[in-house]
Amino acid sequence: MKIYLVGGAVRDALLGLPVKDRDWVVVGSTPQEMLDAGYQQVGRDFPVFLHPQTHEEYALARTERKSGSGYTGFTCYAAPDVTLEDDLKRRDLTINALAQDDNGEIIDPYNGLGDLQNRLLRHVSPAFGEDPLRVLRVARFAARYAHLSFRIADETLALMREMTHAGELEHLTPERVWKETENALTTRNPQVFFQVLRDCGALRVLFPEIDALFGVPAPARWHPEIDTGIHTLMTLSMAAMLSPQVDVRFATLCHDLGKGLTPPELWPRHHGHGPAGVKLVEQLCQRLRVPNEIRDLARLVAEFHDLIHTFPMLNPKTIVKLFDSIDAWRKPQRVEQLALTSEADVRGRTGFESADYPQGRWLREAWEVAQSVPTKAVVEAGFKGVEIREELTRRRIAAVANWKEQRCPKSE
């Protein structure tokens, strides 16, 4: 029995990045031998075991053979005669097909070290094309390591295009697509994930609402980058700088979906694109089974982001009504989330990357003023039933009006 550290732990250590999870491959052993040594078997489809002390995963070396469609259509073979090189060959990228023995020596049968040095994401073998999930995984790795200047090898991107055009992505379940997307949204450069999907044709298949934005112009005065698709990726990049939250980043990604519905004869204007985009947000989220909390914020951002941009022009009643509409009294975090997504929208434009966004500050200040109005005082004043809400709203409007007169200019 020989044990090797494999995959991401080896890769990230060589890149000087923190190692989160360690996976091991066991060569020359059997399930019974692992059980006798105190390991706990957890793998149903192939032999994976948990170490009795560390609880890290130890998998018997195995090979895979395509036996059906999609990313689950594989038959696994695990036996003592499967070599380390056999096991590494089934992996997606050369940089993930690295192993380390107990002496610290790196085993690199597929030039993963060279590709690490050259910052290349390259597939190990043509078997890459048998698993459509790998298209999303490579896009995610491209986003994860974009800050290290990694790029996808030309032949790998070409294979991803072939897989997309062959309809392989249609075998992916909504849950897996969302899971990869959610993971990509946590990276430092999530916009790269969607750019890669567009480069290989997968964006049109998996995210048609976003793909439809490319080639749709916006007024050059407000959008020097012109193209709404480019603007969308720029705003996502900015959102990633402003917030680590997946819901903020996803909502920013979806904020302009309504512009894809504007008839070409009305370009570059997009009046009413916010409310129009709400239906597309719902459509996308229902298809991918996006969690409700993330979906709800994306709907609100699509509907109200333009309203935030005009904040100095809003009357106090409209401001308080906005807080009602986003359910801020029960979910106060939405005020901050709306401020961040709106700021990402403004700064996600060519030449505006460092722009100030006072509307975000005013939104936060107005919220602090509105929520500081005490409900207890209204009750103690003798109001009852529905009168309490009505009087509370009146007092909130008055408080915001007083604040606005002192702190918020009438135009910007």
Curated annotation (Swiss-Prot):
Magnesium is required for nucleotidyltransferase activity. It comes from the Bacteria. Keywords: ATP-binding, Hydrolase, Magnesium, Metal-binding, Multifunctional enzyme, Nickel, Nucleotide-binding, Nucleotidyltransferase, RNA repair, RNA-binding, Transferase, tRNA processing. It comes from Escherichia coli O81 (strain ED1a). Residues 228-329 form the HD domain. Pfam families: HD (PF01966), PolyA_pol (PF01743), PolyA_pol_RNAbd (PF12627). It catalyses: a tRNA precursor + 2 CTP + ATP = a tRNA with a 3' CCA end + 3 diphosphate; a tRNA with a 3' CCA end + 2 CTP + ATP = a tRNA with a 3' CCACCA end + 3 diphosphate. ATP binds at residues 8, 11, 91, 137, 140. NCBIfam families: PRK10885.1. This is Multifunctional CCA protein. Mg(2+) binds at residues 21, 23. CTP binds at residues 8, 11, 91, 137, 140. GO terms for biological process: RNA repair; tRNA 3'-terminal CCA addition. Monomer. Can also form homodimers and oligomers. Comprises two domains: an N-terminal domain containing the nucleotidyltransferase activity and a C-terminal HD domain associated with both phosphodiesterase and phosphatase activities. Its EC number is 2.7.7.72, 3.1.3.-, 3.1.4.-. The keyword Nucleotide-binding applies. Belongs to the tRNA nucleotidyltransferase/poly(A) polymerase family. Bacterial CCA-adding enzyme type 1 subfamily. HAMAP family: CCA_bact_type1 (MF_01261), CCA_bact_type2 (MF_01262). Signal peptide: none annotated.
